[in-house]
Amino acid sequence: MRRRRGIVGIEAAIVLIAFVIVAAALAFVALNMGLFTTQKSKEVMQRGLEEATSALEVDGSVIANVTSGSVDAIAIPIKVSPGREGVDMSVDKTTVRVMLPSKFYENAYCGVFDGSSLSDSKLSTITSSIACTTGWAYLVIFNGDGDNVLELGEKGLLVLELPTPLNSYEEFKVEVRPVQGAALTVERIVPASLPTGGAVSLG
């Protein structure tokens, strides 16, 4: 009669340990895959949120410069939205679309200017000191570091030297589209009563 050799205790323990090690390795891989997928999902959601929200926001009242009873220039104060570090406002990275009563302009933007050389931040001072040859909308950065990026703590003034003046009750719309984030849209109506000259708040 043949004798059958059974598995002794030490061999069973070795097999069991091997199974445990393999199971632990598989669990580790599965856990890592899950964490990686979760992280990627968070990144996609964050990018989607950034694209859906504007990187810029209006920082105060929109100002109009009035000459001979009509608005000939507009200044929109803007800043970086909370949670953003900076927005590149270079002429090749930003588009400024303007809707006037008489015409729509696909892109009136001509770039960034440093406001540190100006004597003050009045709209009349800016328009008399800065010449924009490739368009009539430009950004002046105050408290900046000399580059084209609008950063936290810096003040931006988007100036529009209108090709045709605006009169009372007329409406305009400005859409600022940086390379990232949703567009910033500003709409205003010229007040019914305008002085012959000076600055007027449009709210």
From Swiss-Prot:
It comes from the Archaea. Its main location: other. GO terms for molecular function: structural molecule activity. GO terms for biological process: archaeal or bacterial-type flagellum-dependent cell motility. Residues 1-6 form a propeptide. Keywords: Archaeal flagellum. One of its GO terms (cellular component) is archaeal-type flagellum. It is found in: Archaeal flagellum. Flagellin is the subunit protein which polymerizes to form the filaments of archaeal flagella. NCBIfam families: arch_flag_Nterm (TIGR02537). Belongs to the archaeal flagellin family. PANTHER family: FLAGELLIN B1. This is Probable flagellin 1. It comes from Aeropyrum pernix (strain ATCC 700893 / DSM 11879 / JCM 9820 / NBRC 100138 / K1).
